[in-house]
């Protein structure tokens, strides 16, 4: 029996209007129920395991945990009609999970799609759809699709608040020719790439996604992916890079992102990917913060901090805006601010260093922003006794160090008048102190600075004077 009713869906499904039609209870043969339903009907599907389905009319399917499974050469859910809504299903083990073909106005919400050979959720030649709140994980691991969520030749879709974890290659993949899509608020972790855009993907909004802990890059754009807006995303702890632009992927805007603790590069831009604007990002704690083999990129207003190599520019790029907008904040810039003006020639402070920050011999940031100095290795406490020793005596050294990365080597050496003297002492961690005994046996009488050297696993180094030791002659010997 069919009961005419209003079906009000929750706001989490992003359905703005009330659906008019019949509400049907389904407990067996879901495909038969779909075939018998009329456009606009709502199907409430009971718990259970159902075979693959094809939807060719405007329907609203509500799963409440029902399972849809298919063989590994079939799609679990084929959507071939506009304005279909499907929510609350566990979809698994198909060739595709949920596949949208040449449709618009569809909403796919709050489903879990796992263990499919091809994409978990796929949109093919489909515009104006919403994919929200889904978990598309562990797809394409042994198959040939590799994707959590896949868009091909798709425009004006909203892909929001989904999780794509542990897929064969891509959390979300756009290929080819996908434009004006919104990719917002997704968690794309544990894949090879978090978000991968390939071939003529333009004018997309990439916003507030977490693209971290992937085995290659968090976000990767290749082959003429241009005019995209990449804002307020997090790209941390990816093995290769936080963000990569390659093969003529230019004219993109990259703003307000946290790009931190990535293995090789925070941001790499290569192979004629020209004319990008990189502003107001936090690019830190990577082997190389920014790597450029392209030109005409504008880089300013960024915090570039604590990278082993802050920037490597092999093109012709601009590292500051015109005065008074300025350049970037560099954690290893130690200049002063006593002058102001475009040429930094007028007395007065303006927040910019008076001398440029040198990226290389030929590349500079003309207006480095002050306030970014951060030490990766810090001496918290130090003790050196005695302060006066005879030749041959040992000087006991204790130091407590703080490091953001594992310390590989800590040692002490003697310097006199700025020149290294003979003698070396390795400091070994005991409890929370690095300790060692520096022998003065090879030193001539005189005054020496004892300098601590430390190096961590990321290649950061520290050299800091612990104090001065006066070395005197041994008893019975006079200094020459």
Language-model segments: residues:
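Acidic Gly/Asp/Thr-rich repetitive segments characteristic of extracellular carbohydrate-active
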Residues: 22-51
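Aromatic sugar-binding surface patches on proteins
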Residues: 430-437
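Extracellular beta-strand/beta-solenoid scaffold signature
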Residues: 70-78, 93-100, 115-124, 139-152, ...
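Extracellular beta-strand-rich solenoid/capping regions of secreted or surface-exposed proteins
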Residues: 31, 35, 50-60, 68-106, ...
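Surface-exposed, short loops/turns at beta-strand junctions within beta-sandwich domains
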Residues: 441-446
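Extracellular acidic, Ser/Thr/Pro-rich low-complexity tracts
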Residues: 400-405, 416, 456
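Acidic, glycine- and Ser/Thr-rich low-complexity intrinsically disordered tracts
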Residues: 22, 41-44, 274-280, 295-376, ...
């Amino acid at each position: 029996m069919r009961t005419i009713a209003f079906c009000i869906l929750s706001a989490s499904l992003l359905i703005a209007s009330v659906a008019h039609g019949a509400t049907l209870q389904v407990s067996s043969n879901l495909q038969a129920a779909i075939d018998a339903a009329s456009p606009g009907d709502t199907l409430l599907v009971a718990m259970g395991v159902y075979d693959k389905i094809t939807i060719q009319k405007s329907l609203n399917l509500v799963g409440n945990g029902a399972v849809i499974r298919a063989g590994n050469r079939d799609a679990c859910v084929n959507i071939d009609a506009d304005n279909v809504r499907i929510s609350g299903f566990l979809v698994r083990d198909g060739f595709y999970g949920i596949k949208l073909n040449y449709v618009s106005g569809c909403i796919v919400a709050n489903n879990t799609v796992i263990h499919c050979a091809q994409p978990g959720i796929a949109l093919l030649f489909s515009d104006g759809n919403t994919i929200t709140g889904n978990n598309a994980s562990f797809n394409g691991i042994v198959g040939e699709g590799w994707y959590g969520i896949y868009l091909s030749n798709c425009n004006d879709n909203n892909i929001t608040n989904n999780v794509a974890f542990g897929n064969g290659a891509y959390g979300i993949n756009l290929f080819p020719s996908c434009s004006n899509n919104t990719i917002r608020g997704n968690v794309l972790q544990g894949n090879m790439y978090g978000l991968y855009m390939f071939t003529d993907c333009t004018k997309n909004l990439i916003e507030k996604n977490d693209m971290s802990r992937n085995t290659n890059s968090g976000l990767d754009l290749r082959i003429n992916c241009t005019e995209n807006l990449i804002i307020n995303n997090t790209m941390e702890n990816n093995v290769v890079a936080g963000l990569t632009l390659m093969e003529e992927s230019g004219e993109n805007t990259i703003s307000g992102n946290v790009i931190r603790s990535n293995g090789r590069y925070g941001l790499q831009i290569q192979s004629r990917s020209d004319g990008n604007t990189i502003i107001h990002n936090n690019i830190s704690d990577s082997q190389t913060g920014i790597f450029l083999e392209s030109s005409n990129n504008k880089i300013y207003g960024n915090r570039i901090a604590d990278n082993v190599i802050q920037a490597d520019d092999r093109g012709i790029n601009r590292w500051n805006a015109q005065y008074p907008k300025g350049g970037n904040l560099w954690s290893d810039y130690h200049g002063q601010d006593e002058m102001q003006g475009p040429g930094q020639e007028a007395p007065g402070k303006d927040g910019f260093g008076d001398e440029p920050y040198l990226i290389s011999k030929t590349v500079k940031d003309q207006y480095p922003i002050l306030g970014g100095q951060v030490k990766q290795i810090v001496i918290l406490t130090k003790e050196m006794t005695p302060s006066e020793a005879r030749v041959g005596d040992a000087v006991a050294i204790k130091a407590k160090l703080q490091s953001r990365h594992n310390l590989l080597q800590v040692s002490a050496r003697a310097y006199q008048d700025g020149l290294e003297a003979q003698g070396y002492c390795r400091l070994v961690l005991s409890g929370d102190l690095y300790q060692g005994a520096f022998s003065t046996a090879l030193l001539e009488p005189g005054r020496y600075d004892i300098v601590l050297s430390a190096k961590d696993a990321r290649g950061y180094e520290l050299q800091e004077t612990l104090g001065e030791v006066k070395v005197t002659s041994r008893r019975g010997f006079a200094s020459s």
